[in-house]
């Protein structure tokens, strides 16, 4: 492990991809109320359980013709309330036409049945890229919200959840679902990724100093150290 003394450091958020601005990534589908095994439920995230909160999900879609790096972006629910935002794993790249699904088991974001909620995706600077909402006491068992054939956001009462695929097609199956990682805050333990900038003393020798250094921290652990001139 590297022993480092960090002086005059500032925290800089990981930059968002320039391609991700302008509402290029969309929230394509969400599931609020997952059915249980007694009523024909499905284990949507493949963790061995049905009908629990871990199967709530938000599905993102890249409708553009270019790959978009959403690493360091955030998923959140209603602004100034609800659950804490989670930070999407660095280097999460969504290819053109690709879907990625984030389950509550990773995000820890609760979709509120009673009061309804707003689900949002934000870039690395906390600028809102897209958002959707649903009313309170409205979600039905295994009935998702998503974009219908007319391109309207609606409760898809004539369909079933399709995490990882198009809303008007049969579900691709859990083995084919690209599941994303999103790190929520956990008490005093930092989860997520950020870069420290400043003068770094590496402690490898008394004169081992990087005047304009960078340190990548992932989940509270130092992953890389380099000079800005590298």
Show which residues each predicted segment covers.
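N-terminal metal-binding scaffold of metallo-dependent hydrolase/deaminase domains
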Residues: 183-230
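Bacterial N-terminal signal peptides
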Residues: 2-11
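Intrinsically disordered, low-complexity linkers and terminal tails enriched in Ser/Thr/Pro/Gly
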Residues: 5-6, 16-187
């Amino acid at each position: 492990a590297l022993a480092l003394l960090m002086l005059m450091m500032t925290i800089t958020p990981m930059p968002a991809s320039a391609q991700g601005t302008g509402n290029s990534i969309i929230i394509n589908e969400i599931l609020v109320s997952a059915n249980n095994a007694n009523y024909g439920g499905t284990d949507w995230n493949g963790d061995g359980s049905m009908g629990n909160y871990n199967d709530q999900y938000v599905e993102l879609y890249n409708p553009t013709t270019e790959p978009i790096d959403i690493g360091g972006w955030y998923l959140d629910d209603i602004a100034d309330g609800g659950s804490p935002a989670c930070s999407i794993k660095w280097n999460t790249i969504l290819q053109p036409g690709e879907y990625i699904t984030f389950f509550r088991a990773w995000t820890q974001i609760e979709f509120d049945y009673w009061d309804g909620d707003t689900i949002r995706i934000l870039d690395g600077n906390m600028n809102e890229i897209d958002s959707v909402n649903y009313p309170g006491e409205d979600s039905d068992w295994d009935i998702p919200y998503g974009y219908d054939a007319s391109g309207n956001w609606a409760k898809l009462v004539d369909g079933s959840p399709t995490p990882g695929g198009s809303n008007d097609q049969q579900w691709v199956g859990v083995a084919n679902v690209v599941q994303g990682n999103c790190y929520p805050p956990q008490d005093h333990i930092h989860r997520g990724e950020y870069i420290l900038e400043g003068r770094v003393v590496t402690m490898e020798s008394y004169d081992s100093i990087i005047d304009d250094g960078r340190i990548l921290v992932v989940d509270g652990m130092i992953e890389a150290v380099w000079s800005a001139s590298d």
